[in-house]
From Swiss-Prot:
Domain (Rhodanese): residue spans on this chain: 52-145
Protein name: Uncharacterized protein bbp_050
Organism field: Buchnera aphidicola subsp. Baizongia pistaciae (strain Bp)
Gene3D superfamilies (alphabetical): Rhodanese-like domain (3.40.250.10)
Superkingdom of source: Bacteria
CDD domains in UniProt: RHOD (cd00158)
């Protein structure tokens, strides 16, 4: 049986490499949430939290320019580019028991260092908005614009 598998891989190298890469990527993306200990929150669940949860902090990690064009109501802008220089850690001490939702532009631009920064200062309930702000906008949910 093993000889048959090895001969197949030798005869079809290109197909075998593509198959192996596909398997590795599938396993990685399946276990990504577990490996990085990050929880995602759906847009609908975030809307429920905005309406009913008073212990909620929404942090928009996009640039200030994008934030001013439109953001989720009651969110604060802390760009992921300069999170450590902008943030006064003592400010976040009062939010340690809050649920923190971090909004990136989309799921492809999640910065693990940004999330880990908030974990390192003692914030435990950290969620990432699935689909990011692009997902929010594509569903035509309301935004607040500051000009």
């Amino acid at each position: 049986m093993f000889k048959i598998i090895v001969s197949f891989f030798c005869d079809h190298v290109f197909l075998s490499v593509i198959w192996l890469i596909s398997c590795v990527l599938m396993i990685f993306f399946t276990l990504k949430d577990i490996l990085f200990c990050t929880q995602f929150i759906s847009i609908m669940k975030l809307i429920r939290c905005i309406n009913y949860d008073r212990c909620l902090l929404i942090i928009d990690a996009r640039t200030e320019k994008c934030f001013l064009k439109g953001h989720i109501i009651n969110s604060v802008n802390i760009p992921y580019i300069d999170v450590k220089s902008v943030c006064n850690i003592s400010v976040f001490k009062k939010y340690k028991n809050f649920s923190i939702v971090i909004v990136f532009k989309n799921d492809n631009q999640i910065d693990r260092n940004y999330v880990n920064f908030f974990k390192s200062i003692g914030c435990n309930k950290i969620y990432i908005l699935r689909g990011g702000m692009n997902g929010w906008l594509s569903n035509n949910y309301p935004t607040v614009c500051l000009k």
